[in-house]
């Protein structure tokens, strides 16, 4: 072997990568990948341009249908004796009721237990006759007929039950905002008396988009 061949062979040997010279992926690399995935999902959500029925006090979320938004109202049941009932009709703000022909697709109820909550309640939403006085007897019959879904929410040691929302689909009924006067949220306190400061119900009514004012109130 002449000198030039020896020099070329030496260079080739030097070009070979050393075993183990590449470092293993660090934890910071893994964290960066996770962050990138989260940002990608966030960008897709923002790009969709649709409101999301979401709230930190309940598990999971539902994205509004295209062309729809939602209006939320809050209900705080009064004290309910053990084995007794409570009912409250859905009263949306006047600014929403003005568009009474806009369709309603879904009603979602989110049960938010306050720190003192230690009871078991059943919650549902029902269409009730205008003549109904939402008496104990009337509400009891509506819970018993099985005509609408019921959420059973009970005390958990952690203070938060895994499932604390009820979704009621009205799409097939062609209900509109004006019909919401005919619906009521019903509560049954099963095993214990429910105190006034134990529970809050967030009711989200998903409906077709309505015009919004471009002028700030005076």
Swiss-Prot record:
Skewed-composition ranges (Basic residues): 11-21
Coiled coil spans: none
Main location: virion
Cell compartment(s), UniProt: Virion
Residues with PTM N-acetylmethionine: 1
Superkingdom in the source lineage: Viruses
Tagged with keyword Transmembrane helix: no
Pfam families: Cucumo_coat
A GO CC term assigned to this protein in UniProt: ribonucleoprotein complex
SUPFAM superfamilies the record matches: Positive stranded ssRNA viruses
Cited InterPro entries: Cucumovirus_coat, Cucumovirus_coat_Asu_sf
Keywords: Acetylation, Capsid protein, Ribonucleoprotein, RNA-binding, T=3 icosahedral capsid protein, Viral nucleoprotein, Virion
Region (Disordered): 1-30
GO molecular-function term, one example from the UniProt record: structural molecule activity
Xref: Gene3D superfamilies: Cucumovirus coat protein, subunit A
Protein family according to the UniProt entry: Belongs to the cucumovirus capsid protein family.
Domain writeup: The N-terminal arginine-rich stretch does not seem to be the major RNA-binding region that allows formation of an infectious ribonucleoprotein complex.
Purpose: Capsid protein. Probably binds RNA and plays a role in packaging.
UniProt-recorded name of the protein: Capsid protein
Species: Cucumber mosaic virus (strain Iizuka)
Species lineage: Viruses, Riboviria, Orthornavirae, Kitrinoviricota, Alsuviricetes
């Amino acid at each position: 072997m002449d000198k030039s061949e020896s020099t070329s062979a030496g260079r080739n040997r030097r070009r070979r990568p050393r075993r183990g010279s590449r470092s293993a992926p660090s934890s910071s690399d893994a964290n960066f990948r996770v962050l990138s995935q989260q940002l990608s999902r966030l960008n897709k959500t923002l790009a969709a341009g649709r409101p999301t029925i979401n709230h930190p006090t309940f598990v999971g979320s539902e994205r509004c249908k295209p062309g729809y938004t939602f209006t939320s109202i809050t209900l705080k049941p009064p004290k309910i004796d053990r084995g007794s009932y409570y009912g409250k009709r859905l009263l949306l703000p006047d600014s929403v009721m003005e568009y009474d022909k806009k369709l309603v697709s879904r009603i979602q109820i989110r049960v938010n237990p306050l720190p003192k909550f230690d009871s078991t309640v059943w919650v549902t939403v029902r269409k009730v006759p205008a003549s109904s006085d939402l008496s104990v007897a009337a509400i009891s019959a509506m819970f018993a007929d099985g005509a609408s879904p019921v959420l059973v929410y009970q005390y958990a040691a952690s203070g938060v039950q895994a499932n604390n929302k009820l979704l009621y689909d009205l799409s097939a009924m062609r209900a509109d905002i004006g019909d919401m006067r005919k619906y009521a949220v019903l509560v049954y306190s099963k095993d214990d008396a429910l105190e006034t400061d134990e529970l809050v119900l967030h009711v989200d009514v998903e409906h077709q988009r309505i015009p919004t004012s471009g002028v700030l109130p005076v």
